[in-house]
Amino acid sequence: MDNKVVVITGASSGIGAALAELAGKKGWKVVLAARREPELRQVAARVGAEALPVVADVSRREDVQRILDAALARFGQVDVWVNNAGRGISKLVSQLTDEDFDEMMRVNVKSALYGIQAVLPHFQSRGRGHIINVSSMLGRVPYVPVRSAYNAAKHALNALTANLRQELRERYPDIHVTTFLPGVVATDFGVNALGGGMDSRKIPGAQSVEETAGVLLDVIERPRPDVYSRPEYRQQVIAYYASEDLAIPEGGAPPGTRRP
């Protein structure tokens, strides 16, 4: 399918914006969703004529439904839905408040759930589609303790994604479900974390947004269930869970992840 319609949340910056631009270069139709309207429209302008910006807060179910409605009204279909919106935190487990925990679940898990539940009936009616949930290496290995509730949220997102895949596997084999797990990416993720944090763009060895988005683009073209933004990350996860004491392998963390 060469003329895909791709919905990307969290598309005003970072991985989402970079993926939108790559998708535009492929000639695909792109629906970009985010809260920040000026930045979103700037990205849409770079994507080109086949871009549809939708200002929305994906932690609100009605806003997510509005994204789908806008996509269908403009393009008539959706082929790929990328749940990319998210936010980090810089607090230890012992410091978390109810509000902190709820915010991490709302932004990182509920937003993806709303996306899944909005687009899934459309995919089921067509018998095909692709849902991609952007998770994190921190959803597999707790390299950074101060990410606490963010790590927990990404673990929850991974479980939600895996369960959805099993739910659809037999009856809807052409609806693909992907967990995408990047490590440290050179975005404003760190400075935008709840409680602040180190600028991810200044961490040596951080993966560029262009490279990370390129891996995501390949996932869209060649759907797989579980994809890491760098191939060596999979071995790091295997090594962690193979350890009897669940010790993080020395020197095995993605670049910069041992730092807050």
What are these regions (language model features)?
Residues 12-13:
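Conserved glycine-rich cofactor-binding loop
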Residues 26-42:
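Conserved glycine-rich Rossmann-like NAD(P)H-binding loop of the short-chain dehydrogenase/reductase
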Residues 56-66, 98:
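The beta1-alpha1 cofactor-binding region of Rossmann-like NAD(H)/NADP(H)-dependent oxidoreductases
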Residues 92-93, 100-102:
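Substrate-binding pocket helix/loop in short-chain dehydrogenase/reductase
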Residues 116, 153:
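Active-site helix of classical SDR
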Residues 136:
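Residue(s) in the substrate-gating loop at a strand-loop-helix junction
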Residues 179, 198-236:
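C-terminal helical subdomain
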